[in-house]
Amino acid sequence: MAFCEDCGAPLSEGVLFCENCGAKVTENKFAAVKAGKAVIEEGILYTNLPLLAESLQKTEGEVTVILEKFIETAQNRGIGYQLCDASKSIAGCGSVDQHIAIIKALVEKNHPKYLFIIGSSKIIPSIVWKNEASDFESDADVSSDLPYSTLDTASPFDGQEYDFDNCLKVGRLPEIGIDLENYFENLESGCSKLEEAKTFALSAQVWQEESADIYKNISDRQVFTSPACENTTITNLIEENTNLFLFNLHGSNKTEFWYGQTGNEYPTAMDHNSLSYVTSPYFLMVEACYGAFYEGRSCINSILLSALKGKCISFLGSSRIAFGTPCP
């Protein structure tokens, strides 16, 4: 049996980090290299197992098996994740400050590149700041996971600068309505096709010029527009095996839809079923107000959650009002 060089605790076979103190286990890393599973980058898989299991209506053991399987497949891609269960140190959901203290300790010891949060803000809280960039009552505050990247809870509205080259690369997977096993299988399949982008873009007609200027950096294909394209016709335009979507539409905190625009006409361009027929794992980028808003919603009234329930493996959007230019 191997033992941790830092704290002396016994090590389980194959682990990359000491389960007692979090120290990196170099012996197991060398063993992984020898077995053809070289770890190039390291990351933290961060959650609260009891709360996550309760939300998923599974046992902690069942959830652990799912997460450990993901860790194994990620290692085959050169990423060594350490599973960190915040409930070992924090009672209940805890505060952002408490979670950052845990993550800081792991970062200082192991220098990971990635932080993958598993669970909604009810599992691992997001910080909430006063929104200094908006006069809208509905946007009086803004929630963010930025502190988990910078390890700093100070509001960006205070004017400080960030060195993002040296920050954690952070993603969050809300568990609401999601089949974790299905998501991780899609992630594994989709990651193997990163170089085979097949794209689709849809813009509100009034922003077509701006959208085309962005899209040209991704693809030489046309940008479809709404009202010409609506939620009842979009499936006819999406080609088989499309795996990269770009949307520049209106959104609302009152409804689950995304909208096009021409003049004073705002037709429904997207709903929660619009991408349910996509058969390949895909990446989605959206510039729409509340495009990534999910708190208090479910898969039937959130395009974000319905996408993640389907084949979406990465979603980039705004949880509040999105600001952009109407032309290049």
Predicted regions and their residues:
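Cys/His-rich metal-coordination motifs, chiefly Zn-binding "fingers/knuckles"
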Residues: 1-30
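Cysteine-dependent hydrolase recognition
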Residues: 31-328
